[in-house]
Regions:
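Beta-strand-rich ligand- or partner-binding modules
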Residues: 36-208
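Tryptophan-centered motif/residue detector
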Residues: 101, 125-126, 224, 264-266, ...
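Conserved active-site-adjacent core of cysteine acyl-enzyme catalytic domains
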Residues: 244-374
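Ser/Thr-rich, Proline-interspersed low-complexity disordered segments
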Residues: 3-39
Length: 374
């Protein structure tokens, strides 16, 4: 359904990912995108902090203490308010989009993330990319129209789009409580022909191994063990940043209750954001970008996929989707990881060949959780 109005379009059917680790198949003024963090022409991220959010169209929302909250009045907080960006033109046509946010939503409150796009002059309806709070969160199924569809956390387009717009609705059932929003990041990419950029760039010429604590997903509750690579990886990175989040706590805090999965990418980064970190989903196009994060002492959660024989020294033979932590590089450029699917803690830290890792990561979208101190 294509609608020029700001009202949410009818639910647009997307097949949800089967488990937590499967990678998805791949009249306000225009806002200038933020400086790209990756090579132009393939994928970029627009990151809006409080200054950009405060300059968006606000309805029932105000800036308070460095975050956007519901606009309190004498009767308390209203039931809802919206933050709507201007239409953001992109320097290249894109076919895939993943939004992220850093927010808080105490008991009785929540937020909704929506995206719409302009494709060849036609504006889509609003697609819901998540309903989120600290205690309840879920993706929205059955969203499909002629322009695109939602696959859990990812907007996939049938037509190339040249612009997008986001809208966040802050919701409260308690007049004494409000959610707050401090960061929105939107990654968009053209994936039909794969990400351009060097698959294997030169080795960094230095050795670095960040002291990321080790955790194994296979030590978790048996019925969850094979489904929780993402929260286990996230827990390792949070512990690196001195946030005492246990693996079970993170598992509970990222679960997509609509699909019963734990690998909803924005829900994982939102959990990190709720701990006071800056965290969002991005895509990289080369190993150099990954090296830059390690050089800045920032471990990265990456999403990989591989068939038998494609990744030597892995604890498993193959996977249709898996997340792990990149913690460093050897002197010859190989990749040091914490792989959560290792059977015990002693085997979590591993080294993967540089070319093989680049192939199983970048060839399948280069997805990364970028997590840093705010």
């Amino acid at each position: 359904v294509v609608s020029p109005t700001p009202d949410p379009s009818p639910p647009i059917n997307a097949t949800a990912r089967a488990d937590a680790t499967v990678i998805p198949t791949a009249s306000r003024p225009i806002v200038t995108p933020a400086t790209p963090t990756t090579e132009p022409g393939t994928t970029q991220v627009v990151k809006h902090g409080v200054p950009e959010l405060a300059s968006a169209s606000l309805a029932g929302v105000r800036l308070v203490g460095g975050t956007l909250t519901l606009d309190q009045n004498t009767g308390g907080y209203p039931q809802s308010g919206t933050i709507t960006s201007g239409e953001i033109a992109t320097p290249f046509a894109f076919d895939t989009l993943v939004p992220s946010w850093n927010a808080t939503a105490p008991t009785g409150t929540s937020l909704r993330c929506e995206i719409r796009v302009r494709a060849n002059g036609t504006r889509s309806g609003w697609y819901v990319l998540g309903n989120w709070s600290a205690s309840q969160r879920g993706s929205v199924s059955n969203q499909r129209d002629s322009i695109g569809s939602v696959d859990v956390d990812t907007l996939k387009l049938n037509l190339p789009a040249q612009a997008f717009q986001y809208r966040f609705t802050l919701i409260s059932a308690d007049p004494k409580q409000t959610p707050s929003l401090r960061l929105v990041a939107v990654n968009y990419a053209s994936l039909r022909d794969g990400l351009r950029g060097p698959a294997v760039s030169p080795a960094p010429g230095w050795f670095r191994d960040l002291p990321v604590p080790v955790q194994s997903q296979l030590l978790q509750t048996a019925n969850l063990a094979w489904d929780v690579c993402s929260p286990t990886s996230l827990a390792m990175v949070l512990q690196y940043w001195k946030i005492p989040a246990s693996v079970p706590e993170v598992i509970s805090g990222v679960r997509d209750q609509t699909n019963g999965i734990y690998g909803n990418w924005p829900f994982n980064t939102a959990f990190a954001g709720r701990q006071g970190l800056e965290a969002y989903v991005n895509r990289f196009t080369s190993m150099v970008e990954l090296q830059n994060e390690i050089a800045a002492s920032r471990p990265v959660v990456t999403s990989i996929r591989f068939a038998a024989g494609e990744l030597a020294n892995a604890p498993i033979t193959s996977t249709s989707g898996h997340l792990l932590v990149v913690r460093g590089f050897t002197a010859n450029g190989d990749v040091i990881v914490n792989d959560p699917v290792a059977p015990n803690l002693a085997e979590v830290r591993r080294v993967y060949q540089r070319a093989q890792f680049a192939n199983v990561w970048l060839r399948h979208g280069g997805v990364a959780y970028q997590i840093r101190q705010a």
